[in-house]
A protein has these predicted regions:
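Polytopic alpha-helical membrane-helix bundles and their juxtamembrane interface segments
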Residues: 38-102, 138-141, 148-271
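Hydrophobic/aromatic-rich structural module bridging two neighboring secondary-structure elements via a short loop
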Residues: 105-147
């Protein structure tokens, strides 16, 4: 049996790119128009609702319990000097991932602050792989915020709008993202090896899992949580014995990733 490969003509490729650009421009215009219509007070009110609205008592208790752990740890460890950077990195990170699990766009605000602080901590600890990953995270925060807001604004005409619309990967998507994970891991590993890193392919593990996790999160895919779990477990090993706050943060991340997988799986079934 002869299988004929389908060739994409330059005209078809240009048409596809043009359609994507038009969709992006339309969605961006809708987001800007919605923001202009709301005004500063309206945006502040919307942010307040996103942060505090529609949360059950169980969700409030979960948020308060996990987000209080960095403060409990800081003020009960018996050390005279407080690690304020570690404390706020841990707190903003925990709040961020809980908001992600709940499908709240405000997670990106906490994510931006967390990325800035974590960048400093990683640089001071000479974890240069983490530094590069954190720079990528920081850049992705406004992109992710736009994508989530665009999804919300452009789905407002649906009869039954949901707080967020989760998606799941098909087998083709799995193959694509697993291949991309391997490429990033190997590529960054050789890059670190070229600058004589002592652990090139170990450092590049979180580059790959973090990178794909962020892409899937931006695209509203449930499978992001699998990559976050892998990232969290490896990061616990990476920071072991170095910074107590960051270790605790990743343990909480792991727990929240399991919760996030459960919540997003329910959202996928409702979609």
């Amino acid at each position: 049996m002869v299988i004929k490969n389908k060739k994409i003509s330059p005209e078809a490729l240009c048409t596809g790119l043009k359609q994507k650009n038009q969709t992006f421009a339309r969605n961006f215009r809708n987001v800007c128009m919605a923001a202009k219509k709301l005004g500063i007070k309206g945006i502040a009110k919307l942010l307040w609702q996103d942060l505090f609205g529609g949360r059950s008592l169980a969700q409030w208790l979960y948020l308060l319990a996990l987000s209080s752990l960095p403060f409990i740890l800081e003020f009960t460890n018996g050390q005279a000097k407080h690690d304020w950077l570690g404390l706020f990195a841990s707190w903003t990170g925990i709040v961020c991932v809980i908001l992600v699990a709940e499908g709240r766009a405000s997670n990106y605000l906490f994510g931006a602050v967390n990325s800035a602080i974590y960048l400093i901590l990683s640089f001071n600890a000479s974890f240069y792989g983490e530094v590069l990953t954190t720079v990528y995270f920081f850049i992705m925060q406004p992109i992710g915020l736009y994508t989530w807001l665009s999804n919300r604004v452009n789905e407002q005409d649906k009869e039954e709008p949901s707080h967020f619309e989760a998606k799941k990967l098909d087998w083709r998507g799995w193959l694509k993202y697993l291949a991309l994970t391997a490429l990033i891991w190997i590529g960054m590993g050789f890059a670190y090896k070229s600058i004589h890193s002592h652990r090139p392919f170990r450092d590049s593990v979180t580059d790959a899992t973090n990178g794909i996790g962020q892409l899937l999160m931006t695209g509203l895919y449930r499978e992001q949580w699998i990559f976050w779990i892998a990232t969290n477990l490896f990061s616990i090993y990476l920071w072991w014995g170095s910074n107590l706050h960051i270790q605790a943060m990743y343990w909480v991340y792991t727990l929240n990733s399991i919760v996030g997988w459960y919540q997003w799986s329910k959202a996928v079934k409702k979609a």
